[in-house]
Amino acid sequence: MQRARCYLIGETAVVLELEPPVTLASQKRIWRLAQRLVDMPNVVEAIPGMNNITVILRNPESLALDAIERLQRWWEESEALEPESRFIEIPVVYGGAGGPDLAVVAAHCGLSEKQVVELHSSVEYVVWFLGFQPGFPYLGSLPEQLHTPRRAEPRLLVPAGSVGIGGPQTGVYPLATPGGWQLIGHTSLSLFDPARDEPILLRPGDSVRFVPQKEGVC
């Protein structure tokens, strides 16, 4: 059993955080726990993260300590959730103006730009959780050969649709924002559109594959 610790954060929330390692199996149990918590009357929101879950309480002043005890027990009882997974292909133009850090990643990894693209697009990724921005997917299973530290100095503006690598993870920026990930490409696919019936394109558990476009490195 993977050990966990619970603690208060701010004035309204409790966090359950797992010890390393980060695995898809433990992430599936976090999804199940979040699903269980969201229907409870004293829970405002249950937010799954990477190896953790944050629970916002309706009456924290009277429930927080009890919630810590119960969260620990519920984690020990939780089972994996196999969500209804969709397979989504994301077209990407690698390199060029939309992927200004492709050469940096290639140099760091000792690969050619073409090899970086081939590796990055060869994997079927899983959406572990959404965060940072509405619809920003944190994707697991980035090949270890592509792990690259974030930029020492974040950019003041990263365009929407930018595909990046940050340490052991890869993802796509749904909206323009400051950001520190290494940008290797750009997609025209909209990951967040408030005008859609479902504004957020991806959900935890979805499978994603990046498809190189002929306009870029491929």
Curated annotation (Swiss-Prot):
Effect of inactivating the gene: Deletion of the gene slows growth on minimal medium with ammonium as nitrogen source.
Pfam families listed in its UniProt record: CT_C_D (PF02682)
Reaction(s) catalysed (UniProt annotation): 5-oxo-L-proline + ATP + 2 H2O = L-glutamate + ADP + phosphate + H(+)
UniProt keyword annotation of Hydrolase present: yes
EC number(s) given by UniProt: 3.5.2.9
Top-level taxonomic group: Bacteria
Key words of the record: ATP-binding, Hydrolase, Nucleotide-binding
Molecular function per GO: 5-oxoprolinase (ATP-hydrolyzing) activity; ATP binding
Quaternary structure (record): Forms a complex composed of PxpA, PxpB and PxpC.
Role noted for this protein: Catalyzes the cleavage of 5-oxoproline to form L-glutamate coupled to the hydrolysis of ATP to ADP and inorganic phosphate.
Similarity annotation: Belongs to the PxpB family.
Protein name listed in UniProt: 5-oxoprolinase subunit B
Name of encoding gene: pxpB
